Amino acid sequence: TWMKNAAKRGARIVLADPRITDIGRHAWRTLQFKADADVAMLNALIHTVIDEGLVDEAFINDRANNFEALKANVMGCSPEAMAPVCGIPAETLREVARAFATAKASMILWGMGVSQHIHGTDNARCLIALCAVTGQIGKPGSGLHPLRGQNNVQGASDAGLIPMMFPNYQRVDNAGAHAWFEEFWGTQLDEAPGYTVVEIMHKALAPDSDPHKVRGMYIMGENPAMSDPDLNHARHALGSLSHLVVQDIFLTETAWLADVVLPASAWPEKTGTASNTDRMVQMGRRALNPPGDARPDLWIIQQIAQRVGPHAPHFVSSLPPEGAGPALGRPGGGAGLNWNYEGEESGVAAVYEEMRQAMHASIEGITWDRLERESSVTYPCLAPDDPGQPIVFTDQFPTPTGRLQLVPASVIPAAEKPSAEFPFVLITGRQLEHWHTGSMTRRSTVLDAIEPMATASLHGDELARLGVQPGALVGIRSRRGMVQVRVRRDDGTPRGTVFMPFAYVEAAANLLTNAALDPFGKIPEFKYCAVAVEALPSTKGD
């Protein structure tokens, strides 16, 4: 893999994770911090950089605001003070901070372990601050790289598939952005941000008197009956709907609850683009026809639009020539919504052209014809002859001042701490063989043969204390639910902690998780909740 090859070439990899995973074998140093102590650990690193005179003064003076507030905030966060909080020796924290600050280039890559906490936004703010105070932004080999959850999450976010954003990360409640998109689409747009997934589930169970009660859902390519926190609550919400439509390539657990299932096509069965975390817009070409009644998502959406009702406004069917200004969405007369676009594959090239105009500040120079020739182009790319900019933030940031705003973060405990009744911390996540909720990988006979059943990983000392052997059946219980699962010995999992993948419907880890949200990003705390682990009578001592 990329990381292993980098280690072989001499790159110093630091693994920061409550669990020691396989990549730890290739790491120069491992920071195995306590599961909710991200901010404590990161503030200690920032403190060391400032305390030992390793700050990139030119970067801070020329390109960042609020440094003095950040400095004051971490004043009491020395490695010696934070070591008992985060569980990492002070000298190790100092060593890693020095190495990060003095390297020619340092970068940070992170996954869902950073964001899936009630302090997930603060975790990200600390990572940004660490890169800023060391000047590790805007130069080759540096920067912050959030590894997105799956293919084209980046592209979907870029295109505005976020409840509080228009395309290109223009806020819905920003008056200027709102006016621009109303003119672009030729229609009135709601001024209020939408709900996130967990908030939608709450609204599905709201009283009938709530004017914002959710009574129906149309779910595409998502499996919230497995992926949402506190699944008993989420499944109850889905089951209470007046109407549920699920559009997916397989009959998922969510589809089991649906009134209507629309069979969609898989990635090789449609043409379109995907963007990754490196900001590469990539062309994907249809290689196969969809099986049976399955159809591409775009075709399904267009057919639904045509049938929404006789009094719906009519929309123009194609974009005007480039440079002539937007026209799609101007109301006319007629029945239904005409969301058809001219061209092959349901007009996918015209849809992309609309997106290119909506995201003109990022992908204006990446035309459909260019993608067909080059297959992928990196953005920002603002002209047809622009090769794309693989390095961003070289001289300014996309803020009103062009400068980075540093935001101090304080240590915030998890929403739910262990207790005498629930003494373990549960961490959920993925595993190598099964992706997310397993809707695809568990249908792969090879992968399912390698990992055919749900397991819970515990340290060997915890198995001994419970009086069970690897492979024994245990009950894991939280304040929200209980599952029975086989245990696996994993000494990389810290004592007092359980790790479970969430891919298995027969032992759905999210029956246990807490729906507490980060107040800014509105992401649930999948990475921390309190549970009890109990040896079942029939297996204890086996």
Q: What does each of the following model-derived ranges do?
A:
Residues N73, R94-M107, I200-R215:
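Glycine-rich phosphate/diphosphate-binding loops that line cofactor/substrate pockets in enzymes
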Residues A7-V14, R19-A103:
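Long, well-ordered, tryptophan-enriched scaffold segments
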Residues V55-I60, M107, G138-H145, A312-E322, ...:
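Flexible, glycine/charged-enriched surface loops at secondary-structure junctions
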Residues P291-E374, T437, T441-S457, D461-D542:
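Long, contiguous, secondary-structure-rich segments that constitute the structural scaffold
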